[in-house]
Amino acid sequence: MGYTIGVDVGGTFTDVVLGGTSGAIAVAKCLSTHYDPIAGIVAGVTWALGDRDPAQVTRVVHATTLATNAVLERKGVRVAFVTTQGFRAAVPLGRYARVEEDRYDLRFSPPPPPVAAGDCFEVVERVSARGAVLTPLDLDSVRRAAAAITARGITSAAVCLLHAYANPVHERQAAEVLRESIPDVVTSSEIWPEIREYERATTTIMSAYIGPLMASYLSQLRERLAEIGIRAPVHVMESSGGVISAELAARRAVATIESGPAAGVLAAAGTGFPDVISFDMGGTTAKACVVRGGTPEITNEFHVGGKGSFGGRRAGTGVPIKTPAIDLAEVGAGGGSVAWLDAAGALRVGPHSAGSSPGPACYGLGGSEPTVTDANLVLGYLSSASLPLTPDLAAKALDRLASPLGVSREEAAYAVHEIVSASMASAVHVVTVQRGIDPRGFALVAFGGAGPMHAARVAERFGIGTVVVPAHCGVASAAGLLTGALSTDRVLSRLDAPDPSAVFTSLTAEAAADLGVSPSDPGVVVTRSVDVRFKGQSHDLTVSWTPSREVLAARFFARYEEVYGIAQRGEIELVSYRIRLTAPTAPPPDTTPPPHAATPTADTTPPPHATATTADTTPPPDAATPTADTTTPPDATTPTADTTPPPDATTPPDATTTAPPDAPSAAPVAPDRSTLAPAPCPEDSTPSPSPPHFGAGAARRGTAEPGATRTAPSTATPSGAAGDATARDATAGDGAAAAVPRARRAYFPETNGYADVPVHTRDTMAGAPLPGPAVIEDAESTIVVPPGWTATLAETRAVHLTRSTTCQTS
């Protein structure tokens, strides 16, 4: 059997999904290792593979935040910018549009340009907008620029000459000379030959800025995977949702900046609903995207590194990237987002995140600031009986907010929950209401480790009556990678090209060569489109291509009216020609577990990298019984009274009938997995093993053969050295935490505070609707069903939340 592996590296967690043609699936979740991202990948892949032969892996598809983080943290390589004489200041001068956050800031200063003014160089040449050579390239000026660049110790250069999209000959000649002394040189005609000088320049600069990092990273990734026996091709997802080879991704690194969020949108598009709003909330950020007719919305320009980033919707706030990307709105709101009080004493949440180290206070890894995860634990939405969390630490953190606000702990916690839900709703607002889309006709597809806990509250703000939580929602982005097809985009600007067919043919041949296919191969699909504008206007709109000028004009008029709300007619002109070439891959694995699955054989083998020196001797918190969760959130007796015992009390406020998480063990040995009670994987803002021992790179695994899920945490020291493993084996479905429903106290304002609510898994709720308030503990997340909502389990094992008509109209 051949296997495909999807790997999604996020700001807090690294998710791995292994799919096979028979429908078997294994999932792993581990803390992202920011000091060495590949360490977390290897740990997760090792756990997901288990006893399977790594040589049977046929494909690894990867989505990474490496490029995004390099831009946001300004950790790329130093870049030299080479341009036409007289235009050196175009990029340093830049553009910036003030946003709400800094509109009245008297000390405001725009972000620094992507390249320093002293690192910009000019060469003598000139080409017209139609491609005619007005001044030949002076090669001596190129050599002088190369010498100056080398003298400064710069090893990466971006070449963007005026109107090179119309005639790239000078760029190619200049690059040839520069490569004699500079290792990494990219040209705008190679990266994205589209009209608009500033955007084309910044796109080229960003590719040179992150390209060497991406090339080194992907090379090391292939080497490290080969060390564990995986020699399959490594593919990387582009921002537009296509998948390309690692070699091509290294050359076109700028096209991978939004690869991680794109994978999640593909997963949302595959839920079976034609019109959905993708809602992905992880540990650091939340993303929203509109999918209409099963196809995600695409933008041809987005901004990265800006303040208050909303993807392509906050033009001017960051560095413009002129490549296709799934049109996302993103906010700094995740499970690890820190709650704080501003100078006026108002409660704020985010955008700063506790990340994976130290993480939320309840992790017990040294964090003390209150986060969204801590608030959800205090509210009873998370269980420390099945997850290795410390309620006392969460309570202490929330007290830091409650005391100055003059409210009770649970009121402060719910305020955090509401504020972060409102923040995430702003992302949904950007991609729907702000563009004239009524969200009430859409289903909200929630995934990511923290998304299902907040999805219903976000939906309520827009009158959305259906929320869909797909199977394996906590690793949906990694699962979406398995469905990605080989695909790439190309563009060329030609003002009213005399032979559009020849332009499309050239672009198609170029894209096919990059993917290693022929345009005539079976299953290869080429989608053509063109940018059209009214003559005399500078902004254009993209419409699908047709050779008929009249039909093309009609499509443009209709699109213009849809976007701007104005019916206008006039003479049009064609600006840029676009193609997307998609090549077939092996059929995607069926990652949906059947409703009734057999119990897998217990895996009692420690992971290959386990060592005895860093053994986790902590018994699992839920090892005593799989059927009772007597968790009581802190101060759960009333919505206003604080009855939480002090941190050093004998019994913690989230007491269970099991041994305490820090109970001593007779010997540092790994427990027998077959004797441990099953428990769900953590949501995307909580660690897997017990907090005192959980470090970066420790993985948590779930397997299904087919459909059954086994979750297995391991431990690792913060330096990445792995320790002995503990494991929990679930009996069926998505990691059922118990054979029968349980109950615990959770806070809902509709119930006037804390109330006993049922706690189910996808298996225990099968066959009957589950009215709220209720909690569904999933394999990698937790689904909160508020009052007025009803949960049902679909045949695809997706959980559907529907809101009562009375609630929607009230």
Task: Mark where each language-model region is.
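Long, intrinsically disordered low-complexity tandem-repeat segments
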Residues: 591-664, 703-704, 708-709, 716-717, ...
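C-terminal, non-catalytic interaction/recognition modules in large multi-subunit enzymes and RNPs
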Residues: 9, 140-148, 271, 283, ...
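Terminal amphipathic helices with adjacent charged low-complexity linkers/tails
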Residues: 160-204, 208, 571, 576-590, ...
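Short, ordered loop/turn segments at secondary-structure junctions
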Residues: 21, 84-87, 162-164, 190-192, ...
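Conserved phosphate-binding loops in N-terminal lobes of ATP-dependent enzymes
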Residues: 6, 15-17, 26-27, 31, ...
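Glycine-rich phosphate-binding loop of actin/hexokinase-like ATP-binding domains
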Residues: 19, 27-33, 80-86, 246, ...
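N-terminal glycine/serine-rich phosphate-binding loop of ATP-dependent small-molecule kinases
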Residues: 1-79, 128, 135-158, 171-192, ...
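Conserved short loop/turn motifs at secondary-structure junctions
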Residues: 58-59, 158-167, 207-210, 413-418, ...
